[in-house]
């Protein structure tokens, strides 16, 4: 299912979420220049650099950040940015701009390290040398936070060409279950990279996001809006 809208209106313009989306497209277009296409791999993250079993073009302490803004194809970036546009705005609305920015990068780091640990522990040496890139780990953290903050909101989307409406609880729950199943299949198949998809990054990011949202909500530091407030808020 492709999500198109969550039916919730943010109380404030989601400046951080929009800026992240713009930055991702800007970086994508930059690396699409003919003489720079090969350079995308130089800025990608390589799991083997963490345990020094290989030497990557960049230190892993830098490349985990740069890799979050890189994508391998148009469908890769469009899918990621669609999910971020639909779910990110209201997570930022609840967190506040600066906290959301820190959360996004922290989620990306946790997701990257989860994938790295799985690859180094269960994958082959060749898989540890496969470049990791994409924003999906950080976006998975956003989805996990949304799952906790807005479980009863309605997600409007498409299954193939058919419009559907489903609660966020079931949509994101099903999404997470799929990632979890695929990650476990990757384990038993000795393919921790999941056939080119970083499923462990998605699982790690989602769990991190859900835990952070739960803790911050319990501490009173995050204030998700209720549906009646959302209905009266300006549309963003």
Q: What do these predicted regions represent?
A:
Residues 1-236:
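A detector for small-residue-rich transmembrane helices and their helix-helix packing motifs
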